[in-house]
Structure formats: structure tokens, C-alpha cells
Amino acid sequence: KKICIVSGDPNSINSEIIFKSWNKLNKKTKNKIILIGNYELLKKQRKKINIPINLNKIDKIERIKTHDNSLKIIDYPLKFNDCFKVKKTQAAKYVLGSLNLAHQLCIKNEIKGFINCPIEKNLIKKKGIYGVTEFLGKKNPSNKFSEVMLLHNKKLSVVPLTTHIKIKDISKYIKKNLIIKKINTLNIFYKRLFKKEPRIVVLGLNPHNCELEKNSEEVKIIIPAIKELKKKYNIVGPMVADNFFKDSYKNFDVVVGMYHDQVLIPFKNFFKFDAINITLGLNYLRISPDHGTAKDIIGKNKANPKSLLKCIKFFDNFK
């Protein structure tokens, strides 16, 4: 079983966390890894950050030789002058193209899924697409499932109902059918991945759940959705969000919030690099490190590879 890693944003710490992770892996795991990226770019970045690693360019997965100690790279084209300052137009083509290639390899069943390293959202942002989760959701259309962003640590997982949208627009997106479809997807895929029925809690949207006023989103949308979902799943809510993450979260496996920062701020504060991002609802497994491109430390050899290593371990154990 191959572990495919997509190198992601060229203007980032990605090559550094890939190289550092590689040097911490055992030979058996190394033999499973293929990287989609630009060979020349990675060579130049390796030289700049001065991390010893052997790189080997390949053109097809089946031609991988497993007996050597080199990182196998499926070379994807990229035009650049400075290896850490690639122009935005070229970086966008590279990121979209390499994600598309990984998707096609999954569709052809050459790989079971992939890990993508961090990507600046502006490189793939267009109408209706705000991040990799939505990008892959559009490529995996389903009437039954919806793409779901699950941030996972062994102690807790969180799901934002809405992902990379502006705060002022959140209430427009919150619909009963969306809540039901997302939580259906969450429950089914969580059981597949973790072999257990999740204990799910849903947070309200408004401060103090707007004291459950009759025109609030809680009363009109969230409570009716939860009432319907309770017939099938272990789910409660809506809970008031402001003090929920003090202790109450410990009674649940998954916390579903109404928007991105409602659940990601406390989650990242708890677990920092000790977490991964999983997209549920796809025809294959897609995971990524739970952090961004860290442009402030590019090329400084200060990046922490822990989250990528967790991704590799999770993927390697996936059956």
C-alpha cells in the first residue's frame, strides 16, 4: 500500500516538514511513500534548508524501486526562479495540478488516498471553493454525503459545519438539511475510520443560544435538525459554546460547531501539532497536517514535522 504525499504550496515550510519526517521514518514506511512535487524545486529547497536526504525522480508508481533509501518523487512541472518565492500564478497551477493528479490516481485505484501538505487558500479559491476540503468535495459529488472537515486527536475531534467563509455570511449557510447531511456523513465515516459509534455534541450559533428565542437559528434550524438526527445517532445539543471547552467536551468524541473558529481555536490551543485534518465524505482517504504554510519561518529550519508524521502514521495504519 503506497502512502502518497502531495507537496502542496511551494512557498511554505512543506519541503522542510517532508524532509524532516522522512529522516524519522523506518525503512519499511519509507518504501511505501511517494511524493507528488517538482523535483528541481525540491532539490533547491533541500540545499537552502540543508537537510540531508536522497531524492529520486520517477514517472510511474509501478516503477518504484523499494530497495534504495531515496524519497521517490513523481515530478510535476513548475516554472520558478527563486525556490521559496514562486510567483502566485505558477504556484496556483502547480498546487491545483498536483491535487488533480493525486485525485486521478485515487480514481484509477493506483493509490488509496493521499496526504496533502499545507496550501495557502488564495491559490485555490474561486466561486464556491474556499479550501482543499471544498475543492475535493466538488470532485466527489454525492447526493448522500457531504464533504466534512474533521480535525482529529485521539482525545477529541471537531467539525465546523461551515468552513472557510466570512463570519458575516455564516447564518446564510446554516440550514437544517446541511446539518443533517454533514452529521450523516460524519457518523458513517467516523465508524469506518475509528470502528466506533461517535458521541456527538452540537454547539449553538449565537451567544447563550440567543436564549432560545423563537426566531433564533437554534430554534428554527438547529434544534429541529438534532431532533431528527437523534432517531439514528448518539447526539445532543445545541450546547452553549462559550464555556463548553472548559470540561464538557470530555464527554464526547466529536464536537460540531457552526463555524470554523468556534471549534478550531480551542482545538488548536489544546493540541497544537498533535492533530490531523481528515476530509470525510470522499471516495478515498484525504488527510493533511493541522497547520498552515508558516511563511514567517520558511527556509529557517524551524518547522515542526509532528503533524505530518501523525498523518503518515494514520495513513499507514488505515485499512
Language model region names:
Residues 1-319:
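Anion-binding alpha/beta catalytic cores of soluble intermediary-metabolism enzymes, centered on
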